[in-house]
Amino acid sequence: MDRVLHFVLALAVVAILALLVSSDRKKIRIRYVIQLLVIEVLLAWFFLNSDVGLGFVKGFSEMFEKLLGFANEGTNFVFGSMNDQGLAFFFLKVLCPIVFISALIGILQHIRVLPVIIRAIGFLLSKVNGMGKLESFNAVSSLILGQSENFIAYKDILGKISRNRMYTMAATAMSTVSMSIVGAYMTMLEPKYVVAALVLNMFSTFIVLSLINPYRVDASEENIQMSNLHEGQSFFEMLGEYILAGFKVAIIVAAMLIGFIALIAALNALFATVTGWFGYSISFQGILGYIFYPIAWVMGVPSSEALQVGSIMATKLVSNEFVAMMDLQKIASTLSPRAEGIISVFLVSFANFSSIGIIAGAVKGLNEEQGNVVSRFGLKLVYGSTLVSVLSASIAALVL
C-alpha cells in the first residue's frame, strides 16, 4: 500500500511540475497519457518481476557480455597485459568496448536492418502515443543511434519541422541513451535495471511531453522520409567511420570524466572548507543531496537513503551519468536493493546540462536556424528530460 501511495504522489508531482511549464494545457489529451502509463506499468512489471521478462533480460545481458568479450580481444591486442592486470580498468573495460559496439551498429545500419526495426517499432508507438510517426521513429532511432547522429537521419526535413516537434525530437534524444554505450552501463549497473530503463524511458518521454509540449500533427506533416545515413559509401568506408566515431565517443567520455570528477572534487573541498568555518563541513555533493532529497523520497527511495540517492541524482544532472554511476558503485553495498534499483533506472539517460550543447551542436551542424531554436529551449529540455527519468524511476519503484 505504501508503494502505491508513493507512486500516486510521484505521478502528482511529475504532473504538476510538467503542467507548470506546459506550452498549451488545453491541447493535452489525457486519454493517451493514461494509455501510455498503463502500458508502462505493465512493462515495468514484465521486465522486473515476471519470469519471462527476467529471462529476456538475462538473455539480453548475456548477449552484451559476449559482445564485450569480443571487444576485449581487440583491447588485449592493443594494450596487452595492461587489460589483463586490471590497469586503466575503466578506460579499457568500460569505454574501449564502445568502439566495437559502434562498429556493429554501423553494419546493421548499412545492411538496412536497423531502419526496418526503427520503422516497425516507431509505427507501433505512433498508434498508442497520440503523436506523429516522426516523433515515434525518432524515439527508436535515438535509442539506437544516439543523441547526435540520430538527427542526421532527418537532415533533409529539419528545416520544415515546427518548433513544437523540434522540442519533442530533442527531448526524446536527451531522455534516451545510445545502444553503443549500453554495454558500458551494464558493467556498472545491474543489467535488468538498464534494460528496464531503456524501455520505460521511451514511454515516460511521451507521457511527460504530452503534458509539457502538447500539439496536434497535421496530415500534411506526416509524409516523413528518413535519409539514408551513409548513402553512396562502400561497406569499409562506413565501417571505418563508425569505428572512429566509437573511439571518439570513448575519448570524449574519458575527457568529460577527468574534467567533471576533478571539478566536483575541488567543489567538495571548497564547500567543506567554507561550511567548516561555521562548524558544519558539508561537501558540494552533500548540499546537492539535500536539494534532491525530497525528489528521491517521492520516487520511493526510503527516507534513510534518500540523501545519498539525492546526491547521486544531482551529480548526474550537473555532470553526466557515468560520473553518477561511479559514485553509485562506491555506495551500492550500503543501499537497499529497492533504493539501488530506483536510482539505477534514474541514471540511464542523457538528461544533464552538457547534453544541451551536444544536441544543439548536432542540429546546428545540419540546420543553423533549428540549432538556434534548440539552444533557446535548452533548460526546458533538461527540465523535461529529468522529469522523464523521475517518472521512469517512480514506475520501477512501484514493482520493485
From Swiss-Prot:
Membrane topology: Multi-pass membrane protein
Pfam families, per database record: Gate, Nucleos_tra2_C, Nucleos_tra2_N
Catalyzed reactions per annotation: adenosine(in) + H(+)(in) = adenosine(out) + H(+)(out); uridine(in) + H(+)(in) = uridine(out) + H(+)(out); thymidine(in) + H(+)(in) = thymidine(out) + H(+)(out); cytidine(in) + H(+)(in) = cytidine(out) + H(+)(out)
Regulation of this protein's activity per its record: Transport is inhibited by the proton uncoupler dinitrophenol. Inhibited by the nucleoside antibiotic showdomycin.
Signal peptide span: none
Gene Ontology cellular component terms for the protein in this record: plasma membrane
UniProt KW Transmembrane keyword: yes
Annotated compartments: Cell inner membrane
Residue stretches spanning the membrane: 4-24, 37-57, 87-107, 169-189, 193-213, 251-271, 282-302, 342-362, 379-399
Note in the entry: Binding of nucleosides to NupC requires the presence of hydroxyl groups at the C-3' position of ribose.
Official protein name in the record: Nucleoside permease NupC
